[in-house]
């Protein structure tokens, strides 16, 4: 119920167009033009975030970094190569297939996306909130929306037993909070993953990483004053079903 108090403040802080192995599927299901627009929209989002941080002059630990999806299994290399070829179809030179990465791991292959980014999600959330307020916007925390209706050409938002009427409503929650259309509540489930931050006392790598095989583990570095720490996140599973 607070800014960055839940999922938004607990992400890995990666800002990337590389959503796993996805573009090969997207081209097959939606076509090259749709996939190109998807890639361009994500790239524009990275640039917009960078611009907002520059304008607000807030320290959000923003850094341009390359992003990698890698595998240690030879049987998955072909999948990565097909993904790289698919990305090449919509933007030549955006990605490349490589056999070595800066991580101290032996790998079978990886796809690298150039000039992606990482940041501190909570610092950015606060900077964004400040920018909204500075532009005469208002933010209300602890204000749970329970329903949205269309009445007399307006939207009526029900909040904490009160109503707000608006010409336009933008829903930017992690998943839609309205049941119709979509019935998303019938399709969703809770999942759990784990994060570790460690001071490994060594010079750390550049870049952001996630492996293709299951379980997925994500790696990146984070700033802590003069130190760089290792952040590892992964072992996602359906809550209440599996044992670690």
Task: Describe every region a protein language model picked out.
Residues 47, 55-63, 145-147, 163-244:
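Active-site substrate-recognition segment that forms the wall
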Residues 12-37:
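N-terminal glycine-rich dinucleotide-binding loop that anchors FAD/FMN and/or NAD(P) in oxidoreductases
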Residues 95-99, 139-141, 159, 171, ...:
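General beta-strand structural signal in soluble alpha/beta enzymes
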Residues 1-10:
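Glycine-rich FAD pyrophosphate-binding loop
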Residues 9, 13, 40-48:
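N-terminal FAD cofactor-binding segment of flavoenzymes
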Residues 21-28, 48-127:
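Flavin (FAD/FMN) cofactor-binding and adjacent substrate-gating region
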Residues 78, 85-89, 110-168, 172:
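Helical element adjacent to the flavin cofactor pocket in flavoenzyme catalytic cores
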Residues 30, 115, 234-238:
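Short, histidine-centered active-site or binding-site loop motifs used for metal coordination
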């Amino acid at each position: 119920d607070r800014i960055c108090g839940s999922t938004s403040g607990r992400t890995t802080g990666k800002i990337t167009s590389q959503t796993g192995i996805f573009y090969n599927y997207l081209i097959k299901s939606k076509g090259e033009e749709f996939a190109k627009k998807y890639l361009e929209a994500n790239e524009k989002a990275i640039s917009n975030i960078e611009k907002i941080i520059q304008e607000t002059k807030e320290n959000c630990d923003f850094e341009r970094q390359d992003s990698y999806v890698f595998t240690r299994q030879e049987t998955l290399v072909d999948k990565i190569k097909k993904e790289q070829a698919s990305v090449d179809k919509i933007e030549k030179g955006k990605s490349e297939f490589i056999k070595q990465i800066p991580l101290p791991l032996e790998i079978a292959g990886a796809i690298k996306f150039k000039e992606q980014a990482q940041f501190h999600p909570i610092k950015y959330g606060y900077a964004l909130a400040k920018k909204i307020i500075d532009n005469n916007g208002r933010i209300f925390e602890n204000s749970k929306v329970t329903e949205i209706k269309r009445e007399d050409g307006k939207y009526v938002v029900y909040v904490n037993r009160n109503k707000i009427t608006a010409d336009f409503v933008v829903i930017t929650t992690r998943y839609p909070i309205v049941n119709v259309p979509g019935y998303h509540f019938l399709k969703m489930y809770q999942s759990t993953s784990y994060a570790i931050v460690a001071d490994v006392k060594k010079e750390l790598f550049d870049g952001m990483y996630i492996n293709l095989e299951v379980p997925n583990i994500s790696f990146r570095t984070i700033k802590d004053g003069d130190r760089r720490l290792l952040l590892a996140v992964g072992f996602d599973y359906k809550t209440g079903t599996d044992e670690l």
